[in-house]
UniProtKB/Swiss-Prot annotation:
Name of this protein: Glutamyl-tRNA(Gln) amidotransferase subunit A
Superkingdom field: Bacteria
Its job: Allows the formation of correctly charged Gln-tRNA(Gln) through the transamidation of misacylated Glu-tRNA(Gln) in organisms which lack glutaminyl-tRNA synthetase. The reaction takes place in the presence of glutamine and ATP through an activated gamma-phospho-Glu-tRNA(Gln).
Subunit structure: Heterotrimer of A, B and C subunits.
GO cellular component: glutamyl-tRNA(Gln) amidotransferase complex
MF (Gene Ontology): ATP binding; glutaminyl-tRNA synthase (glutamine-hydrolyzing) activity
Catalytic activity as recorded in UniProt: L-glutamyl-tRNA(Gln) + L-glutamine + ATP + H2O = L-glutaminyl-tRNA(Gln) + L-glutamate + ADP + phosphate + H(+)
Pfam family, one: Amidase
Gene symbol of the encoding locus: gatA
PANTHER family (UniProt xref): GLUTAMYL-TRNA(GLN) AMIDOTRANSFERASE SUBUNIT A (PTHR11895:SF151), TRANSAMIDASE (PTHR11895)
The species this protein was found in: Herminiimonas arsenicoxydans
EC annotation from Swiss-Prot or TrEMBL: 6.3.5.7
Active site: K74, S149, S173
Length: 485
């Protein structure tokens, strides 16, 4: 039962072959037996209460596709009934007075919350080793990182601990862990998914999205996740659409752009081989490969690491120990309380980014760094628009290598940052991008570590991306493979 897709589980629920309560119990049991550290907060009584309500809804005949389907939320989305910690000591015991819009949308659809998922602290990281609550292990190889910052979200799907999870992507935090855990994830166009109740890291980049087993499942989840929200000033108002509408469209005549900058010196040979094999599969499906250039790709890392920390230093100034969250025990006056609270409450990586952000926003440096970065960001977006005159979608690797060993890059933040080279530019441009599994690494160690293929589309082209991904998943079985129990 735990290996079935959302679509399959939905059919079983609607025909009453299984109840939402039985399904929830099954996944709660699997979660309890797992040693991946993917889940942070679980409340079985609350989960079973939601499941019973879903069963009633199904019995009364007003259930939707997602009614009764279990889901787990990245601990960046605030929840009224579960703790919302953002993976930080700063919010260790925080319980929100309201639900994030994304959580609200899924509750209204009748989904059953299994709990909150581990992530890098305040979503800052590429390996899920920056969580105050400990690292998450990759289910394919427990000595490897799962990717980040949504490591718990991807690991829980790969280990079949939940059929659906929410995640957030600021510079690659949906796509990179999805790739390294061999599952499917999509970051929608910026503004598609409400950020209300999503603990902010970098407000002009943060975007929520789903991680699941298949592209079809991601489409079903997006149907509920995407909504206009007046409480989020960056929310985009568009007509409601069915993201699964084009899944079965043939790919004959599709033009796939292959950026030459994504296949350079930094890309490991086994990742390149898996990605090129996937591109060959697309040619068999009737697509044409087109050589394109995204010349500002290498500038995406310095640009991102000016803009994101600048916004983070501003966003995280609200955590001062006064109204909520952690407060230092011993202090002499207000100023001392602020200093000690933030010194003790934030982890090393978060403090590093706050310092960088404060520096680039400071007098005398703002023009030299922040303003320049915003100009380059615009040029990166223009590169993509130029490319889309030649092709329909863009494809390449998600990450330059398969997952590395836990602790391997712990002392080298820059090496961690470089893992996002292929995902950052999409985020800076605000474009939709997704990751689908397309193979494994090579050699004794890497042969069990997955590789992801990245598919990037133009603004609001999520249905197109899901179609392109779904057609590949109809022709291959990478998405069906699962780690040994």
């Amino acid at each position: 039962m735990h290996t079935k897709t959302i679509k399959e589980l939905s059919a079983l629920l609607q025909t009453k072959k299984i109840s939402a309560t039985e399904l929830a119990q099954l996944f709660l049991k699997r979660m309890g037996a797992s040693d991946l550290n993917a889940f942070l907060h679980v409340d079985e009584a609350l989960t079973l209460q939601q499941a019973a309500a879903a069963d009633q809804r199904i019995a009364s005949g007003n259930a939707g596709v997602l009614t009764g389907i279990p889901i787990a939320h990245k601990d960046i989305f605030v929840t009224r009934n579960w703790r919302s910690t953002a993976g930080s000591k700063m919010l260790e015991n925080y319980v929100s007075p309201f639900d994030a819009t994304v959580v609200e949308n899924f509750n209204q659809a009748g989904m059953v919350t299994l709990g909150k998922l581990n992530c890098d602290e305040f979503a800052m990281g590429s390996s899920n080793e920056n969580s105050y609550f400990g690292a998450v292990k990759n289910p394919w190889d427990k000595t490897a990182i799962p990717g980040g910052s949504s490591g718990g979200s991807a690991a829980a799907i790969a280990a079949r601990l939940t059929p659906a999870s929410t995640a957030t992507d600021t510079g690659g935090s949906i796509r990179q862990p999805a790739a390294l855990c061999g599952v499917t994830g999509i970051k929608p166009t910026y503004g598609r998914v409400s950020r209300f109740g999503m603990i902010a890291f970098a407000s002009s980049l943060d975007q929520g999205g789903p991680i699941a087993k298949t592209a079809e499942d991601c489409g079903l989840l997006l149907n509920a996740m995407v909504s206009f929200d007046e409480r989020d000033s960056t929310s985009v108002e568009r007509d409601k659409e069915d993201f699964t509408r084009d899944l079965n469209a043939p790919l004959e005549g599709l033009k796939i752009g292959i950026p030459r900058e994504y296949f350079g010196a930094g890309l490991s040979a086994d990742v390149e081989q898996a990605v090129r094999a996937a591109l060959g599969e697309y040619e068999k499906l009737g697509a044409t490969l087109v050589d394109i250039s995204l010349p500002k790709t290498e500038l995406s890392i310095p640009t991102y690491y000016v803009i994101a920390p600048a916004e983070a230093s501003s966003n995280l100034s609200r955590f001062d120990g006064v109204r909520y969250g952690f407060r230092a025990k011993d202090y002499t006056d207000l100023s001392d309380m602020y200093c000690k609270t933030r010194a003790e409450g934030f982890g090393e990586e978060v403090k590093r980014r706050i310092l960088v952000g404060a520096y680039v926003l400071s007098h005398g440096y703002y023009d030299a760094y922040y303003l320049q970065a915003q100009k380059i960001r615009r040029l990166i977006a223009q590169d993509f628009q130029q490319a889309f005159t030649l092709c329909d979608v863009i494809m390449g690797p998600v990450a330059p290598s398969v997952a590395w060993d836990l602790g391997d890059k712990a002392d080298d933040p820059v090496a961690n940052y470089l893992a996002d080279i292929f995902t950052l530019s999409t985020s800076l441009a605000g474009l939709p991008g997704m990751s689908i599994p397309c193979g494994f690494g090579q050699g004794e160690k890497n042969a069990k570590r997955p590789v992801g293929l990245q598919i990037i589309g133009n603004y609001f082209a999520e249905a197109k991306l899901l179609n392109v991904a779904h057609q590949y998943q109809q022709a291959t079985d990478w998405h069906l493979r699962q780690p040994a129990e």
